[in-house]
Amino acid sequence: MNEQYSAMRSNVSMLGTLLGDTIKEALGEHILDRVETIRKLSKSSRAGNEASRQELLTTLQNLSNDELLPVARAFSQFLNLTNTAEQYHSISPHGEAASNPEALAQLFTRLKDKKLSDQDMRSAVDDLSIELVLTAHPTEITRRTLIHKLVEVNTCLSQLDHNDLADYERNKIMRRLRQLVAQSWHTDEIRKLRPSPVDEAKWGFAVVENSLWEGVPAFLREFNEQLENSLDYRLPVEAVPIRFTSWMGGDRDGNPNVTAEITRHVLLLSRWKATDLFLRDIQVLVSELSMSECTPELRELAGGEEVLEPYRQLMKNVRTQLTNTQAYLEARLKGERVLPPHDLLVSNDQLWEPLYACYQSLKACGMEIIANGQLLDTLRRVRCFGVPLVRIDVRQESTRHTDAIAELTRYLGLGDYESWSESDKQAFLVRELNSKRPLVPLKWEPSAETQEVLETCRVIAEAPQGSIAAYVISMAKVPSDVLAVHLLLKEAGCPFTLPVAPLFETLDDLNNADDVMTQLLGIDWYRGLIQGKQMVMIGYSDSAKDAGVMAASWAQYRAQDALIKTCEKAGITLTLFHGRGGSIGRGGAPAHAALLSQPPGSLKGGLRVTEQGEMIRFKFGLPEVTISSLALYAGAILEANLLPPPEPKKEWIEVMDLLSDASCDMYRSYVRENPEFVRYFRAATPELELGKLPLGSRPAKRRPDGGVESLRAIPWIFAWTQNRLMLPAWLGAGAGLQRAIDAGKRDVLATMCRDWPFFSTRIGMLEMVFAKADLWLAEYYDQRLVDKSLWPLGQQLRDQLAADIKVVLAIANDDHLMADLPWIAESIALRNVYTDPLNVLQAELLHRSRQQEHPDACVEQALMVTIAGVAAGMRNTG
């Protein structure tokens, strides 16, 4: 363990030294001395030295205004560099994830040991489907400018790992590292302006360009190698089990900045970026495919006998087509009215066919080694990314559709749709869906809100088929919510059937999800429309905010289990779409554990999951990390489908019902029923100040004047992560477990922990949260920021946290947290030394900021830096 970490620690230490040198050069020895003193006090404080802790508090409280920003920036930048070193470590020759592709080989060996046939395994590989949905949740706090520099730091660390470097080569790399650290120090880490939805979409395209474009074909090569070695099976060229979708530019739920016009623009921009990236690939193929021998079919396709280099000629034709398409899209993006070229690329087949013809010809002529080079990678990119690059989901809230149809029925004199019973709504919608005449009159002038809903449906109808992946309805509650969207799409003239996915996201809605889908599947028209396929989205973040993490996760499990059984009975292939966040309070969990803790059968229809904010960078920020992350996903899905987890025993279900109810009651007794809670939350966390951070394009609140219930799940989690109480990720869970112990179920809990992946994952997640939470820091925030009348409430919550930690350790039969994942414990310990001063400083800055009549620019800027720094230290924001 120590050996494995010594490489990472030495990289962290080296980057810290370079940062120290940079600070000294920029601001002088006295600032570096101050930073170093604080670091040593923090280290000693963490080791349990009370005198050092007091001195740390005093030192940070007494910083002058001139020292605030440099100190905050020093610790914040150090944590960014630590994250970079850790990310590199995960893919370096010393790290664990370096062996992730090998883990697939171990999985196949284990499956064979369990007497699974090669044919079973091949079938599971053929059915493998991973769709990752990139979302622009405002949790990526680090600026893109800095991310580029950190990626380059990663490259330098990789170069330094070569053993055969000459001195001048090593010196050159070190010089580049010094430059990068200095560039980062002299760059503002906080954005000045909030990104627009188009900026967010461009950030998503940058992830594709800088990482996924290389990472996906590289993963498929690794995967294919493991299949050949273990199963003597080759991945077919057309089989690309990975797709990427995006919510950036399509998710308008609670975000008035995402309009129909924005979605139209992002769709064009996405297609333009695809032509740009494919042009680079084709340019390489034009230069590489200089062979003359080919099949008669290919020669004819290339233009006949007189063509000397048929492959090259075909590639030049594709290049012309891409160039013409790009010019057309560019003109459209500028707002010009232009006629499309005769060879406009709108479908993946147009790209695939000439490339695949070259591939088949090369193989037929004995040039398989050439076929399986760059050409194969490009073919796989066509299958994975294609002409749209990333498909877009459109997401809108259910009441917006209800309001639009109600406005229409009132205009037509049919009554007020909104006030009708659910059965009347369904009857009306099915009647109209079966009708051949349009419902929306040509001359009708609806309100701006309704116009926007109708215009969005028109954008979908006009988009090339395959560029929109699904329409997600947030806060779906009843069958009419789904039928309403189908009617609006029909009225817009949508020529294809788009998957419409209800999103069930509160405790009540999760509990009713199966009933809603049973009703829908009972409608003949609906069954005919969906052609045996249904997508349902399970909301993790809002259900946890509504009921607490334990009750929410059990409701999610039960809902999924019921939906799987209902769809199986009806002969429907169900795709469950998981709306997980990066943090535990929003359903985040290490991918492998999360997937294996789903109900049996939940991954038969493939995996569709959101990848959010800063988690995109941690999992897909580099091609090598992408390979490792995709290997992890593929392995977990194959394992879950071939070795499904056990069905929970009746006794386990009863225990979960008991502790889920108890945990929900405890959670709501604070969050909903305690009249002091909202006041305490606003005082003890930087919730109000978070609104000033220009993070995402989406407002932090659904309603500006509301309480906790109107807060989006992300700022709710973000705020509690900052003050280290981490409340949404544990409140209620320990109380529920204690209730089960009091009911004499301790032995049952121990068995569940050992034999049931769902339960052991929940316990593991709680341990991780507890390891990141910190009682003395949470108490310090109270002392500096909270009115004394509210101190007892803070004390109650901290006492509850301390009690919960004991309960979880007892059930897990461990004497300290994270005993079975020492590398995570190591990572948290490494960061705490640097995160603690940022927390203390943040409390001090919040205190100063709230005392001042007029904002002090220096205090405000330093405060924003501490927020970014703590987020980096915790490795997640919301």
Curated annotation (Swiss-Prot):
The coenzyme or cofactor needed here is: Mg(2+)
Q: Name one GO cellular component term.
A: cytosol
> What catalytic activity is recorded?
oxaloacetate + phosphate = phosphoenolpyruvate + hydrogencarbonate
Q: Where is the active site?
A: H137, K545
Per the UniProt entry, what is one GO biological process? carbon fixation
Molecular function GO terms recorded: magnesium ion binding; phosphoenolpyruvate carboxylase activity
Q: Top-level EC class, please?
A: lyase
**Superkingdom, taxonomy of origin:** Bacteria
Q: What Pfam families does this protein's entry cite?
A: PEPcase (PF00311)
| SS bond partners | none
The EC number on file is: 4.1.1.31
What are the entry keywords?
Answer: Carbon dioxide fixation, Lyase, Magnesium
Q: Of which family is this protein a member?
A: Belongs to the PEPCase type 1 family.
Role according to the record = Forms oxaloacetate, a four-carbon dicarboxylic acid source for the tricarboxylic acid cycle.
Q: Which protein are we looking at? A: Phosphoenolpyruvate carboxylase
> Which organism's genome codes for this protein?
Yersinia pseudotuberculosis serotype O:1b (strain IP 31758)
